[in-house]
Amino acid sequence: MKSQTFFLLFLVVLLLAISQSEAFIGAIANLLSKIFGKRSMRDMDTMKYLYDPSLSAADLKTLQKLMENY
């Protein structure tokens, strides 16, 4: 009976360790996809698409300041 209890406890701890490591690996994969994903790379170029010939350099500078924390 003691060996069965020990075996059950061991399996529960093993399953907990596997699920925790899976969540950790998933979080790392999610972070990497956010950093290197296509959407993230496109979002870094937002100022490139704001170019309008009628805007002055001061206007662009003001827009960049406004978009810094967006």
Swiss-Prot record:
It is found in: Secreted; Target cell membrane. Keywords: Amidation, Antibiotic, Antimicrobial, Antiviral protein, Cleavage on pair of basic residues, Membrane, Secreted, Signal, Target cell membrane, Target membrane, Transmembrane. The modification Phenylalanine amide is found at F36. Residues 40-70 form a propeptide. GO terms for cellular component: extracellular region; membrane; other organism cell membrane. Residues 1-23 form the signal peptide. GO terms for biological process: defense response to bacterium; regulation of defense response to virus. It comes from the Eukaryota. Expressed by the venom gland. Antimicrobial peptide with potent activity against bacteria. Has strong antibacterial activity against Gram-positive bacteria S.aureus, M.luteus, B.subtilis, and Gram-negative bacteria E.coli, P.aeruginosa and N.gonorrhoeae. Also shows low activity against HIV-1 PV. The mutant Kn2-7 shows antiviral activities against HIV-1 (EC(50)=2.76 ug/ml). This activity is correlated with a direct interaction between the mutant and HIV-1 envelope. Belongs to the non-disulfide-bridged peptide (NDBP) superfamily. Short antimicrobial peptide (group 4) family. This is Peptide BmKn2. It comes from Olivierus martensii.
